[in-house]
Amino acid sequence: MYKIKFTLFFYVLLSFSFIGKSAYAANDNINSLANSYANLVSHYYNEVSLSTQEMHNAIIKFVQAPDNNSLTNAKNKWIAARSIYGITEAFRFYGGPIDGVNKYGEEGPEGLINAWPLNEAYIDYVKGSPNAGIINNLTLEINNNTIIAANMSEDDADVSSGWHAIEFLLWGQDFSLETAGIREASDYLPTNEINIRRRAYLVATSALLLEHINWLSMEWLENGEGRKAFLNKNDPGGAILTGIATLAGFELSSERIATALDSGDPEDEHSCFSDQTHNDVKANFNGIINVYLGKGLNGESFRPSISEFVAKNNIKLHENILEIINETNISINNITVPFDKMLSEPKNGPGRQAAEKTVSNLLVLAKNFKEAGKDLNWEVIIAE
């Protein structure tokens, strides 16, 4: 994950405003922007697919030979894949393949991939309830159909699949402000029926996540249905800005940071078992930046970008966006790690203040994105 260097970005983006009209004209149209964005999305989903495959391979190796080393490796692969997936959440909220409904009436897989918060007892044993969850319910066969059917079947917190189900199965419950959950590798030794079911559940959930990620990757390939649908949108610029404005102005600021700040409950943090919520926040924010600037995972350039259109149309607004991006980057990096430790701080604690500042900055950023859309005659809707 690269870090934001504001001065560099500022002068690179500012230079776009001085590109001659003849040089810019070739790319100064909405079709070029839509294709560039589709290439960016495809790039990231391909990267997530590769990293999720690595995680799945590590999980299989762990289950085959459960010990602390193989468990740690599986956890590290989860963190690596998760950090890239978080960037792709900037591709949500406008009816795309991830969370929209396609022409066949089929809903995207987002709820099976990233639903949270998660009721741990719905899946497996928890403190005080040693026989809880699907894993301990011997009447249920552990397979894809069971996991999919169980996901949020009666309550939104009854999450059975996706990143956070895997996270819980790898880390277990987190009872400490200093460390993440500490599940024992011995939970996966094939010494009893429940452990065997737990092994099967972890592998099945990981395979299901990989299947959904691979599907998303294929949707955005050159001839993918999701890509075609996006390129046929009447207002692709508005869709792109809606995605990053909603992530900034609602999902990340409100749902993922402010809700936890208001409740003070670690259960409201995004990746509470692994203590990776701070990286979730950074990944989501990087997704917003990368869409705006047209940047790939390793700094690849996808042009034209939204930022070029904004800068050419309203350089002052573009400068304001870059400034608030820089300020938000600073406030995010000042949030206490781990996130649950920050939640335990008093209201005037430095980590809490940084989190509050991040929320307010993200709201300003979303407002600026919406203003940019209005200036460009694109419809930007901040979904809630």
What are these regions (language model features)?
Residues 19-25:
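Sec/Tat signal peptide C-region and signal peptidase I cleavage site
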Residues 7-18:
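Bacterial N-terminal signal peptides
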Residues 1-5:
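Positively charged n-region of N-terminal signal peptides that target proteins for export
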